[in-house]
Every structure is written in structure tokens, then in C-alpha cells.
């Protein structure tokens, strides 16, 4: 009986310790996983790494087993302020990060905060709202606000399509049913609709992202199939969805990605 009581006591104590330090353990696991990621790199528009000036064809997925583009990171709540408009600013922030990558410009929390506020006002004038911006509306923002000549909204894509753009030096913006990716750092149960940047992939095929929905989102790794299956565009843009179950409604959105080509007007 004493042995049983000792066992129960140890079990309860262990459970309580794990419960108290759960976030710390998650953080340690996250940092350990990030330490094994490929080094961040920049690729010029030809698909050739900048450290190699020779004009060679862009590497294929077979030739290039991993890549991690040097996309800068600041979360959509730059100063941990999750009030409006920041709690709804995943689309704006993803666009800002990709723009800074292509321009090779530095980034700070203050820059992102000010840019988000400008983009919110721009969208209100352009669309009449800034909530739930669709992939096409985000592409319009990238073309008209940021000045990119070519921004593609691609449908019926595959995982290899995404990898091909990454190898060519083009980060990929993806809209998501945010509750399907299982990120423990989201405010649970997670956003119904979300947007993030895919910036690379690992040798074992996982996607490396800058997930603006959490302060821990830099180089956040997702299982490729989990992330791919969660890709759903907003069925409609706007401040509110007049539906009973928005969690089901977002799943009716198409599987699309946004690809920005590094040229400006």
C-alpha cells in the first residue's frame, strides 16, 4: 500500500511540474527544432544564390533538398498588442514581410506597426473593410499599394509547386483555416482565418514558415501535409461572415497561394 501511495504521489507531482512548466518545455522543444534548420539565404530572381554569381539554371527540387529564405520577421501584433487592428492583420503583415524580403530592407516592430495602420486605412478606402482579406484582395494590395508588377494568385497547386517557387527565391503567402494547423502558440482554438509566409522547407519535407500569428512564429516548422491541407482562401472578404459556423465556412474556400515576383513599377 505504501508503494502505491508513493507511486501516486510521484505521479501527481510529476504531472503538476509538467503542467506548470508546459510552456517552457514547448519553447525548449521549439528552439531545439529551429537549431537544425538550414541557414537562411537570399536568392536572386534567376534562382541562383547570391553567394554564387554564375548564372546557372534554377535548382530543381531533386538538386536542392532544403532551403530557408531570409524573410525578416515581426508578428502581426508588433508590441504584443492583440487589440484591433492587429488581431486581424495577418494578411497585411505577411505582405509587409515579403515586400521587405524582395527589397532587402531591414524591419522593426515600429515599421510594421506603422505599415499595418497605413494598410488598414488603404483597404478601407479600396475595399470598404480590412477583415478577412481574400487572396485576390491581398494580391491587389501587393500590386497597387506596394507596386509589384506581377503578383500571381495560383489555384489547384501542389506541395511541389510551392517548393519550386521557394527554390526560385519567391516566398509564398498562404491563406489558411487557422484552426487546422494545430499551432499551440495561437490563442486557442486559433484563428478561423489566417495568413502566413512559407519561406523554405527541410530535408525531411517540412515547411519552414514565418507565422505572424505568434511572437514565436519566426522559422516555425509545420508538417507539409498538415499545412497544405489547411490552405483555404476566405470565401468572401469583409468585416463579418453571416454564417452560423465560420469554422466550416472557411473550409469551403479554395486552395490558393500568392506569389510575388520581385519587380516594381
Feature locations, PLM:
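Sec/Tat-exported extracytoplasmic proteins
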Residues: 94, 98-105, 120, 142-150, ...
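Active-site-adjacent structural segments surrounding the nucleophilic cysteine of cysteine proteases
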Residues: 3-135, 178, 186-189, 203, ...
Amino acid at each position: 500500500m505504501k508503494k502505491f501511495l508513493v507511486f501516486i504521489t510521484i505521479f501527481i507531482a510529476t504531472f503538476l511540474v509538467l503542467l506548470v512548466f508546459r510552456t517552457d518545455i514547448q519553447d525548449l522543444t521549439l528552439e531545439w527544432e529551429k537549431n537544425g534548420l538550414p541557414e537562411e539565404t537570399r536568392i536572386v530572381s534567376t534562382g541562383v544564390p547570391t553567394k554564387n554569381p554564375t548564372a546557372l539554371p534554377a535548382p530543381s527540387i531533386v538538386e536542392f533538398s532544403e532551403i530557408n529564405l531570409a524573410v525578416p520577421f515581426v508578428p502581426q501584433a508588433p508590441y504584443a498588442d492583440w487589440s484591433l487592428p492587429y488581431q486581424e492583420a495577418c494578411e497585411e503583415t505577411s505582405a509587409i514581410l515579403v515586400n521587405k524580403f524582395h527589397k532587402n530592407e531591414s524591419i522593426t516592430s515600429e515599421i510594421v506597426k506603422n505599415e499595418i495602420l497605413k494598410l488598414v486605412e488603404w483597404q478601407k478606402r479600396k475595399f470598404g473593410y480590412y477583415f478577412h482579406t481574400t487572396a485576390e484582395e491581398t494580391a491587389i494590395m501587393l500590386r497597387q499599394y506596394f507596386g509589384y508588377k506581377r503578383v500571381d494568385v495560383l489555384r489547384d497547386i501542389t506541395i511541389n509547386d510551392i517548393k519550386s517557387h521557394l527554390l526560385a527565391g519567391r516566398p509564398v503567402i498562404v491563406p489558411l483555416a487557422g484552426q487546422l494547423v494545430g499551432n499551440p502558440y495561437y490563442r486557442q482554438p486559433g484563428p478561423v482565418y489566417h495568413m502566413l509566409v512559407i519561406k523554405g522547407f527541410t530535408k525531411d519535407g517540412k515547411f519552414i514558415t514565418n507565422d505572424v500569428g505568434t511572437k514565436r512564429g519566426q522559422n516555425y516548422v509545420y508538417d507539409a501535409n498538415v499545412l497544405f491541407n489547411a490552405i483555404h482562401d476566405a470565401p468572401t472578404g469583409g468585416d463579418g461572415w453571416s454564417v452560423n459556423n465560420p469554422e466550416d465556412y472557411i473550409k469551403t474556400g479554395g486552395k490558393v497561394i500568392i506569389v510575388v515576383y520581385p519587380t516594381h513599377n
